[in-house]
């Protein structure tokens, strides 16, 4: 266990490793906010967000203004029936109460924004209020990110210190007659321990910076306009408490999150299995990562179990989770409106894919359906040659509406919500098995990423913005193993580029390019720098030759990208040139090709994201982390 160093020179360099427990939570907050470079990071990201305030106003800006008006003007019994605007309230009740809370402040800024009939209202004060509400609520995301990355750092250092102590003890036992050699070895080990500690601390700050500066959040929240950062803050805080062993607090926070935005059901399988195994069944974590889960043998003997199930833990967990859902949904059960609420939250009639196809498996499926129609290509395939396709169906093959009431697949089999659910469950099995088989918190975080990834790949009516649900938690795994650095770099670059169609106005093109290019360079340089430092530390520990050192230094300045991965990333540059310069000039005015830019972007990024998805299976099956 590493205690706080009173030396003022080290206050900004070494984070504090403290004991687990709920009482330490506020102390940990105080500790992470002591470091000057954390404050520099907060100032930097806040400045960027302020500079983005004049950005264009998307339809989501009006969506949230309308929700402010609905929740402030109407009783809760009418929230999910109000339809003056097409942008009806379709988030769970807790988010409605969040909008209600914001409306109390909005009233003093500009009360006109709270009038339901003021559709499209966007006064300067309204714009500033809504923009600042996102920036301020992001504080939870920033704080929770610093807490979790610092705690993971503590786990790694604590584990390494235990290993080094064991090695020192073995050396002392084996070399009792060589006192001078022992002293030299101990001094070298201490120096190497300090080098490793500084390296992990530097990487901890790098990972925090990469997550907090996430370009997806900047584009979606602070330009397009949503509150994803605030919700990600609740998610990370939930993971933080679960990893440190405060199971009930972590489960309550995740239940709260589900009642803010139901899309986080994508992660529910991983949370459910983790809580079931490590809190309700006779199973404990390794790596000393938790304090509340790991009990003494005497405590375990006193626990009341049936068929290996810890009954009291199961009851406590059930009461904690169900009480949150009762608070959220109880009023709607009482008013007999639960069916109306469900119809708003799960509008299956919207179709398989969004108008701009999310870059997933169904994008490729949709594309194949359209390609077969192009110039009657399907007639050359024996299975389809007798199909009769109406002319009006082939009028605009690049339109994005798929699987809705107005347009479905034409040649390939129609996909229903039941089919997407079945495929999703099948592909969830490996990640669930990984959590059940493992004894480490690392598998839990990877399970969250994999569960979200699977729903993103095969879910019904997935939005492209959901890619952020994968990149944010995956960032923390980069602290664990460099293999995740490569995966994160690829997924981050491809996934965040797939968000470009959200910022479609000409004025936003330089902004979106600058954000992604700057971030991609930051990630690449940060990862190769931390990899270089790690290799140098390993070289010192192993006393390798100078030739080996130089070779490893050369290798360290690379993420190990294969030639085809580099070629694919270069293709993104060519695709953006086509989208910005070629399509608007030569193809946009032709109805047949008016949406081809969106189609190509979706399909091209789908290929890369599917590749990253398969990469996660490799990590799971080979246990390479």
UniProtKB/Swiss-Prot annotation:
Transmembrane segments: 41-61, 132-152, 205-225, 234-254, 256-276, 314-334, 415-435, 453-473, 484-504, 509-529, 567-587, 595-615
GO cellular component: endoplasmic reticulum membrane
Enzyme class, spelled out: transferase
Topology within the bilayer: Multi-pass membrane protein
Entry superkingdom: Eukaryota
Cleavable signal peptide: none
Cysteine disulfide partners in this protein: none
E.C. numbers: 2.4.1.265
InterPro entries associated with the record: Glyco_trans_ALG6/ALG8 (IPR004856)
Pathway membership: Protein modification; protein glycosylation
Region (Disordered): 163-194
GO biological process, one term: protein N-linked glycosylation
Catalysed reactions, as listed in the record: an alpha-D-Glc-(1->3)-alpha-D-Man-(1->2)-alpha-D-Man-(1->2)-alpha-D-Man-(1->3)-[alpha-D-Man-(1->2)-alpha-D-Man-(1->3)-[alpha-D-Man-(1->2)-alpha-D-Man-(1->6)]-alpha-D-Man-(1->6)]-beta-D-Man-(1->4)-beta-D-GlcNAc-(1->4)-alpha-D-GlcNAc-diphospho-di-trans,poly-cis-dolichol + a di-trans,poly-cis-dolichyl beta-D-glucosyl phosphate = an alpha-D-Glc-(1->3)-alpha-D-Glc-(1->3)-alpha-D-Man-(1->2)-alpha-D-Man-(1->2)-alpha-D-Man-(1->3)-[alpha-D-Man-(1->2)-alpha-D-Man-(1->3)-[alpha-D-Man-(1->2)-alpha-D-Man-(1->6)]-alpha-D-Man-(1->6)]-beta-D-Man-(1->4)-beta-D-GlcNAc-(1->4)-alpha-D-GlcNAc-diphospho-di-trans,poly-cis-dolichol + a di-trans,poly-cis-dolichyl phosphate + H(+)
Keywords associated with the record: Endoplasmic reticulum, Glycosyltransferase, Membrane, Transferase, Transmembrane, Transmembrane helix
Function: Dolichyl pyrophosphate Glc1Man9GlcNAc2 alpha-1,3-glucosyltransferase that operates in the biosynthetic pathway of dolichol-linked oligosaccharides, the glycan precursors employed in protein asparagine (N)-glycosylation. The assembly of dolichol-linked oligosaccharides begins on the cytosolic side of the endoplasmic reticulum membrane and finishes in its lumen. The sequential addition of sugars to dolichol pyrophosphate produces dolichol-linked oligosaccharides containing fourteen sugars, including two GlcNAcs, nine mannoses and three glucoses.
PANTHER family xrefs: DOLICHYL GLYCOSYLTRANSFERASE, DOLICHYL PYROPHOSPHATE GLC1MAN9GLCNAC2 ALPHA-1,3-GLUCOSYLTRANSFERASE-RELATED
Name of the protein: Dolichyl pyrophosphate Glc1Man9GlcNAc2 alpha-1,3-glucosyltransferase
Gene: alg8
């Amino acid at each position: 266990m590493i205690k706080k160093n009173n030396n003022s020179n080290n206050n900004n360099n070494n984070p504090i490793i403290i004991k687990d427990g709920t009482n330490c939570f506020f102390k940990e907050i105080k500790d992470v906010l002591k470091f000057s470079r954390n404050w520099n990071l907060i100032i930097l990201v806040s400045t960027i967000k302020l500079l983005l305030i004049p950005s264009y106003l998307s339809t989501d800006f009006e969506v949230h203004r309308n929700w402010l008006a609905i929740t402030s003007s109407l009783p809760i019994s009418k929230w999910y029936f109000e339809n003056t605007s097409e942008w009806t309230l379709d988030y769970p009740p807790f988010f409605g109460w969040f909008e209600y809370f914001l409306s109390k402040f909005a009233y003093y800024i500009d009360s006109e924004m709270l009038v339901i009939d003021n559709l499209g209202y966007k006064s300067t004060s309204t714009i500033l209020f809504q923009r600042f509400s996102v920036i301020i609520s992001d504080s939870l995301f920033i704080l929770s990110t610093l807490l979790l990355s610092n705690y993971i750092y503590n786990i790694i250092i604590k584990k390494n210190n235990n290993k080094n102590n064991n090695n020192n003890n073995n050396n002392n036992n084996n070399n009792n007659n060589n006192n001078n050699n022992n002293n030299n070895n101990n001094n070298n080990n201490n120096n190497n321990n300090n080098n490793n500690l500084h390296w992990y601390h530097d990487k901890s700050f790098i990972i925090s910076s990469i997550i907090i500066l996430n370009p997806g959040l900047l584009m979606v929240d602070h330009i397009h306009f949503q509150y994803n950062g605030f919700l990600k803050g609740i998610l990370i805080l939930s993971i933080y408490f679960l990893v440190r062993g405060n199971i009930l607090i972590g489960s309550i926070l995740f239940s709260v999150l589900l009642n803010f935005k139901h899309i986080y059901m994508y992660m529910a399988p991983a949370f459910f299995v983790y809580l079931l195994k490590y809190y309700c069944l006779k199973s404990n974590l390794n790596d000393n990562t938790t304090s509340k889960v790991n009990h003494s043998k005497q405590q375990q003997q006193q626990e009341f179990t049936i068929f290996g199930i810890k009954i009291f833990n199961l009851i406590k967990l059930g009461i904690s989770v169900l009480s949150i859902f009762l608070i959220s949904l109880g009023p709607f059960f009482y008013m007999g409106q639960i069916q109306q609420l469900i119809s708003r939250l799960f509008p299956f009639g919207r179709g398989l894919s969004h108008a701009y196809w999310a870059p997933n498996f169904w994008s490729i499926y949709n594309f194949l359906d359209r390609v077969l129609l192009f110039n009657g290509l399907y007639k050359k395939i024996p299975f389809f040659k007798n199909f009769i396709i109406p002319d009006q169906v082939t009028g605009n093959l690049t339109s994005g509406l798929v699987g809705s009431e107005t347009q479905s697949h034409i040649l390939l089999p129609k996909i229903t919500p039941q089919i997407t659910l079945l495929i999703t469950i099948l592909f969830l099995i490996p990640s669930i098995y990984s959590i059940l088989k493992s004894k480490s918190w690392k598998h839990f975080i990877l399970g969250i990423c994999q569960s979200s990834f699977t729903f993103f790949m095969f879910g019904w009516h997935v939005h492209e913005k959901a890619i952020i649900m994968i990149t944010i938690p995956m960032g923390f795994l980069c602290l664990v193993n460099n293999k995740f650095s490569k995966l994160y770099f690829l997924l981050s670059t491809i996934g965040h580029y797939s968000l470009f169609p959200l910022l479609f106005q000409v004025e936003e093109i330089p902004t979106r390019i600058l954000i992604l290019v700057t971030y991609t360079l930051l990630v690449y340089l940060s990862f190769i720098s931390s990899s270089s430092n790690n290799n140098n530390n390993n070289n010192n520990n192993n006393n390798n030759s100078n030739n080996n050192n130089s070779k490893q230094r050369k290798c360290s300045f690379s993420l190990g990208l294969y030639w085809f991965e580099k070629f694919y990333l270069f293709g993104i540059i060519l695709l953006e040139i086509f989208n910005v310069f070629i399509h608007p000039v030569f193809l946009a005015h032709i109805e047949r090709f008016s949406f081809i830019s969106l189609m190509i972007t979706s399909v091209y990024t789908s290929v890369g994201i599917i590749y990253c998805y398969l990469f996660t299976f490799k990590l799971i099956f080979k246990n390479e982390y």
